[in-house]
Amino acid sequence: MILVKDAIINGKKQDLLVEGNIIKKIGNVPISEVSKDETEIIDGKNCILIPGLVNTHTHIPMSLFRGVADDIPLMEWLSGHIWPMESKLNEKIVYAGTLLGAVEMIKSGTTAFNDMYFFLDSIIKAVDETGIRSTIAYGMIDLFNEEKREKELKSAKKSIEMIKKLNNSRITGALGPHAPYTCSKELLESTNALAREYNVPIHIHMNETVDEINQVLEKTKMRPFEYLNSFGFFDNVTTVCAHCVHLNDSEIKIIKEKNIFVAHNPISNLKLASGVSPVAKLLENEVNITLGTDGCGSNNSLNLFEEMKTAALIHKGVNLNPVLVTAKEAFEFGTLNGAKALNINSGEIKEGKLADFALINVKKPYLTPRENIESHLVYSFNGAVDSVVIDGKLTLKDGKMVTIDEEKVYELAEEAYLELTK
């Protein structure tokens, strides 16, 4: 058990008791009511307790790509830098990159992430060791080649079955076709069928750039969402669509009608000059908007508090509307909405919810006066949380990793980077 004493929880100073992996009680919990030998007691004095953040679009091993290819367009970034480096990946490099990314996320309050990449065995190993929660998809790209398609689908199916056999409630599987401009119709149709067969979500890149939309238009005479919808890609499945930068009204209507979750990546989209997602229109249509960081190669951070602030600011600016995306809305994008997208019983601090939360010491200049803490978390907090509990287990205590040797992670990451770039 874990007992957090005297923290600010939902606006009030109170205690929180964790039993197993569930928040058992919020209120007054005297120490005398728990077994001291079996309970981790955390002093929450001067701390606010918040739900763990949920990052709905990542490529976690790409933490090793941080700063590698800055300030260039997306297609040049991919073809000239990222894809050539990815051809050198191996299990050791992916493991090191995942460890580094998981540590960064935990230390900035993220308790769950939605990932699409390769070498899933290595990703799973690192996720298991660090204690973070994850939905993991094998990234499929067939480039319209039949032989490649069969291999990709076989690999994706194998990964889903492997994750299910783990029987680890923190690690769940998904299907990850890269995008409509890199995946054939046959692969996308098979993805929907497999998602229904295995009861897993789909994670896909959509409408990130004008160029990719034009590629799909040229091939199909339809925009990407219209094209995928024409053969039932979104039917009877949960779909998380990353980016959604360039959308017309028809596509927004499809997103709403098919209950698609949008993973908004404002910083990555700005850095690659992809554009700004029409969040104002999405909100008007009651679309569930979540937040993602994308990979470190295009961000260069996994700090979701930065995404909250950017999301709250950029849409005010481009729409000349100071009330658009409030601090409360931005915070929910990064917590409750993300939890809904990944079907995680978290995202808010309530009895019966999963014990995924972070503690933040409010005795900091940028969190004072504490009466305005909801605003501070979005507009002024730097993301450096003090303690983190994931699935009822303490993973970060007083700013230091509990589950893994942090110094060793940095050593492995440096070694992996040198191997990747030699």
Curated annotation (Swiss-Prot):
UniProt keywords (A-Z) are: Hydrolase, Metal-binding, Zinc
**Catalysed reaction(s)?**
5'-deoxyadenosine + H2O + H(+) = 5'-deoxyinosine + NH4(+); S-adenosyl-L-homocysteine + H2O + H(+) = S-inosyl-L-homocysteine + NH4(+); S-methyl-5'-thioadenosine + H2O + H(+) = S-methyl-5'-thioinosine + NH4(+); adenosine + H2O + H(+) = inosine + NH4(+)
Q: Which note does the record give on the cofactor?
A: Binds 1 zinc ion per subunit.
Q: Would the keyword tRNA-binding turn up in this protein's UniProt record?
A: no
- The protein's superkingdom reads Archaea
Cofactor dependency: Zn(2+)
Instruction: List the InterPro entries.
Output: Amidohydro-rel, Deaminase_MtaD/DadD, Metal-dep_hydrolase_composite, Metal_Hydrolase, MTA/SAH_deaminase
User: What more does the entry say?
Assistant: SAH is a product of SAM methyltransferases and is known to be a feedback inhibitor of these enzymes. As a result of this inhibition, organisms have evolved efficient enzymes to metabolize SAH via different pathways. The pathway found in methanogens differs from the canonical pathway, it uses the deamination of S-adenosyl-L-homocysteine to form S-inosyl-L-homocysteine for the regeneration of SAM from S-adenosyl-L-homocysteine. 5'-deoxyadenosine is a radical SAM enzyme reaction product which strongly inhibits radical SAM enzymes.
Query: What is known about its subunit structure?
Result: Homotetramer.
Name-wise, this protein is 5'-deoxyadenosine deaminase
Its source organism is Methanococcus vannielii (strain ATCC 35089 / DSM 1224 / JCM 13029 / OCM 148 / SB)
